[in-house]
Regions:
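Helix-loop-strand module that forms the ligand-binding subsite of alpha/beta enzymes
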Residues: 1-58
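Glycine-rich phosphate/pyrophosphate-binding loop and the adjoining helix
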Residues: 60-113
Length: 113
């Protein structure tokens, strides 16, 4: 989250991958959005911007679980371990739901390549 939006580098990468329109790298590829920020609501606004961008790119979005993680020192260790049991459980549940979402999308909108 940068000033309640997505980082410029991420936006630039999405812009490049979104061409040509209609046959871009995101078309029919399921997406889920997770974010963290030191403030309590910064990631929520940034995620809404990202959802709008991905919708324009024709990427089906999982909206049933929204993931707003308040980042605090020590939440993630140097080796990538999530120290909070509740956060780890939430992320595991989120990924299980996302896996099911991918399967549902692939049933309705099979990817051609």
């Amino acid at each position: 989250e940068y000033n309640r939006s997505i980082p410029g580098g991420l936006k630039n990468a999405i812009d490049w991958a979104s061409r040509p329109y209609g046959t871009n790298a995101f078309t029919r590829k399921p997406s889920g959005v997770i974010g963290t920020s030191p403030g309590k609501i910064g990631t929520a606004v940034a995620q809404q911007h990202l959802r709008s961008i991905l919708a324009f790119c024709n990427s089906p979005l999982m909206n049933s679980i929204e993931a707003y993680i308040h980042f605090e020192d020590g939440l993630i260790s140097e080796d990538g371990h999530v120290s909070s049991e509740s956060t780890r459980g939430f992320l595991q549940n989120y990924m299980a739901e996302f896996h099911g979402f991918i399967a549902r999308v692939d049933t309705v909108l099979p990817r051609t390549s």
